Amino acid sequence: MYFKLLWGEFATLPEVEAIALGGSRAGADYDEKSDYDLYIYCASIPDESVRRKILEKHCKYMEIGNSFWELEDDCTLKDGTDIDILYRNIRDFSQTIRSVVEEYTAYNGYTTCMWHNLLHSRILCDKNGELEKLQNKYRIPCPDELRDNIIRKNLRLLTGNLPSYDTQIKKAFARKDMVSVNHRTAAFLESYFDIIFAMNRLTHPGEKRMVQYAKEHAEILPADFEENLDRLFQNMFTDSDRAVQALREMINELGKVIKCSGINSL
């Protein structure tokens, strides 16, 4: 009840052009404890005082204007459900998607997350039909050029170069620098999963449930995919030799499936 009333009030603001529900609540994989991810697309960001006036009607806790990643209001509805409200300029968002899908820009991990967010959001309000047009425009297979760019860029980050993550992780183990081991291993996995999703022409679902998503949707996975991940996690802080061996196996098996798929990774 509170959720519907909240977004309904935002929809009446003249600067708001579209509203969409993202995350697990946009699909079928959620329960009553799942948070709401609400995306409000605006010509200009509604004033904080206007947002507060709406939010205080429907929320029992509010953090207004957090900007750790995107501008957002993080709140708890009066029914106890957390809600993240993110404010975006639809033209800036469109350019971000265009840069990836049409200009084939690859990042250090998470390349197609925003594209995934667009495609898998449920539109609640779309005053001029712009958000639906954007969804329809980009509801296309992953272009070969984008797939190849993601794989090339992130494979070089995994291995084969002096700054590659596998080399950095080995050096961190040698220093007994476990903070660095943790940091570089996380970066390694960001690039590793970016390659896996690109190789399968899947958009990247984001930081949650990546293993589950890959197992459910990817047609091509490296041999011992889950087993090697488990070995890495089990040994990261207890046995550096076994952790490095797990990384080596992950890289080798990933290279094999890339080669078998006929993808040019050079």
Segments (PLM) and residue ranges:
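Short, solvent-exposed loop/turn segments at secondary-structure junctions
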Residues: A26-G27, I90-D92, L202-H204
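Catalytic metal-binding acidic patch
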Residues: G23-K57, E72-R88
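Helical scaffold of the NTase/Pol beta-like nucleotidyltransferase catalytic core
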Residues: M1-A20
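A generic local structural motif
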Residues: K4-G8, S24-A26, E70
